[in-house]
Amino acid sequence: MNYQVGTPGRIVVARFNDGDDILGGLEEIARRENLRAAAFHLVGAMKGGRYVVGPEREEIPPVPVWRQLAESHEAVGFGTIFWEGDRPKVHYHGAFGKRDQVKVGCLREASEAFLVLEAVITEIVGVTARRELDEASGMVLLTLENKESP
């Protein structure tokens, strides 16, 4: 385990309107505001998105199991933003509910708001976290320096 300690910085509140690209919008905010490290919460509704519900098997590199949101769902979740090279990279896990069904996963593509979706983004000041390609997994993962656990 590696870790760093930061402090809360600026807080950004955003509203996504019907049809807005959620992942793209979060990246745009991070780029415009130069948020190099942040955590965010989302609450509202979505009508589209491709998300991953885990690997097919517990092996490395993992083969993702993809699912699709194809209609409106209530949505709530948490995520982080750290940069990969010269661009912000969002990592978001959420729950998506409709009627008596709830789906949970990592939203990765084609994210589309329904009616309204709210975001509260908290900047993390004083950390040097970033995302880098992990050769073994083939995934872009969080990288931290210093403070290894005993």
Model-derived features: where do they sit?
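N-terminal intrinsically disordered, cationic/polar leader segments
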Residues: M1-V90, A95-P150
